[in-house]
Amino acid sequence: MTRYLTLHSIEEAKSIINESLKKLKNEVEEVDLFNAIGRVLAEDVFSNIDIPPYDRAKMDGYAVKAEDTYEADEDNPVELKVIGSLKAGEIKDLEINNGECVEIATGAIIPKGANAVVMVEYTERDNDRVKIYRAVPPMENIQFTGSDIMAGELVLRKNTKLTPRDIGVLAAIGKSKVKVYKKLKFGIISTGNEIISPNEQLEFGKIYDINSYTLVSYIKTLGYDFEFFGIAKDDKEELKEKIKKALKCDIILLSGGTSAGVGDLTETAIKELGGKILVHGIKIKPGKPTIIGKIDNKLIVGLPGYPTSCLTIFDVLFGDEKNVVKAKFPVRYISAKGRVEYLPVILVKHKNGFSAYPITKGSGAITSLSEADGYIIIDENKEILENEDVEVHLFGDVKVGLNIIGSHCIGVDIILKEAKLLAKTINVGSLGGVLSIKRGEADIAGIHLLDEKTNTYNIPFLEKYKVKDAVLVRGYIREQGFMFRKELGFKSIEEIIEHIYKLEFINRNKGSGTRILFDKFLKDYNINPKEIKGYNIEAKTHSAVATAIAMKKADIGLGIRTVAEQYNLAFIPLANEHYDFLIRKERFNDEDVQNFIKALKTAKLPFKKPDNCGEIIWGG
């Protein structure tokens, strides 16, 4: 089988999808108003009646002739005769003359002769007489016929997606049924020998089905229906049987099985069922191996198996148009060769607008999208320069809260939980945190930067990078050292040095305090980094380092004791380090920042707290 013989443009793929959707979406059905929420109107809706259909009282009180009240005030009330009462829904032949009034309830019909309502709060009743303590002008507290909606008025337009408020309008004009476009129904099939349902016991080599659940959720937010046909193993006949059952739906979605490799059977199954392949391969990252085909004129789309690729392609092909905001891109970035890249980003709001931080975990990480506020579209073979303007296509509303950008530490999560704060945490390393404070993006940056000359933490770097308008708050002391699996049996730093060129390392990202500490260690012991296996393999968090070691992807790496213990790894200490918090002065007195500092002092942390924890140690 030829692998991606012709890569199609995104526009070509979307054109095929839109052509099919246009035909399907033109089918109309009539539904009960109780079932109309989220549906799309297939016609303009006009009102046949006035709303309200009669003049009615806005308040409880007394229907009066306004001119009878003109002399009334708190010291000189006007006294009127009460000739009757009206409740909402009551119809009585009442007509008031000068010097008379009618007791009236909210929503009741205004009696003949009345042109205003005095609120009950400004009256005093005595049998069939009432004192009025406030004058009212004509039309006061009356809602007149057709003042909300007039007969013949267009109330909702064709193609409106019905909200609860729209349903209320339809009910108000007497519509019990409404014509809407027929709901599209998606048939969903997951594929792969490794895929199991989330309710099953996870065995080695298996992964839980993510794509079915994310696709169903997205489909429902678009107002469509679905039917799940289960998980198909990498067996052609089993896949064909599930596809045949799914053909009762309008559109069939398969996830996985599109990469044209061993066990990727989607294209073969479609062809053997008499179908036609329209697209196999799109110039997009992520999602290159996408398949679009037809069986019996039913659209069938093979989505990539990686969660981010799968959801991104579905969003591009079927999603609603996104709102767009402009932002600065804080780092240099080179896009994929020959493909348009949809790069997920986290938005950080600051005084000059937004900055868009890229999420580069890869298409296999579901958190790439769960953490993202939106994505930027990068043309093929394009380089984005540092601080270049970009357009961010939003998934929804931009999340608000503290912007915490800097070095990863589980202590930050504990503090946020203790303070019950909403925050975005972006792990870019300590130096990245310092620079984000300088750019005005971060509110707080966790840093632990060891200066080789003075052998002290953080303050020398703030002076070196000429940080202004910020304060450094003392945090806590973490124990950094080597994490490794217990069977390796090392007892000392000297033993690690003795075997260092035989071990497979996993390193931290450039600019992180841990990376700086590791490089200093290598320099102090005259160890050549180029001869360290895995020196250039980088992880962005202590947890990622520990995971790689626990899963035997690496033998050893530098991290904090707390994380080593969490992953049941051995630990040999290398240094005690100060993990402090750099905070912008303009945000220092904000309630959220002060609550963060308070929680820093009070939270039970797995680290040593110095006596001046939570106090300003620089820049005050």
UniProtKB/Swiss-Prot annotation:
Query: Cross-referenced Gene3D superfamilies, in alphabetical order?
Result: MoaB/Mog-like domain, MoeA, C-terminal, domain IV, Molybdopterin biosynthesis moea protein, domain 2, Molybdopterin biosynthesis moea protein, domain 3
> GO MF annotations for this entry?
molybdopterin molybdotransferase activity
The UniProt family comment states: Belongs to the MoeA family.
Name under which the protein is recorded: Putative molybdopterin biosynthesis protein MJ0886
Entry's InterPro entries?
Answer: MoaB/Mog-like_dom_sf (IPR036425), MoaB/Mog_dom (IPR001453), MoCF_biosynth_CS (IPR008284), MoeA-like (IPR038987), MoeA_C_domain_IV (IPR005111), MoeA_C_domain_IV_sf (IPR036688), MoeA_linker/N (IPR005110), MoeA_linker/N_sf (IPR036135)
A biological process from GO: Mo-molybdopterin cofactor biosynthetic process
Q: Name one Pfam family in it.
A: PBP_like
Keywords in UniProt for this one?
Molybdenum cofactor biosynthesis
Q: In which pathway does it act?
A: Cofactor biosynthesis; molybdopterin biosynthesis
* GO cellular component annotations of the record: cytoplasm
Iron-sulfur: present as a keyword of the record?
Answer: no
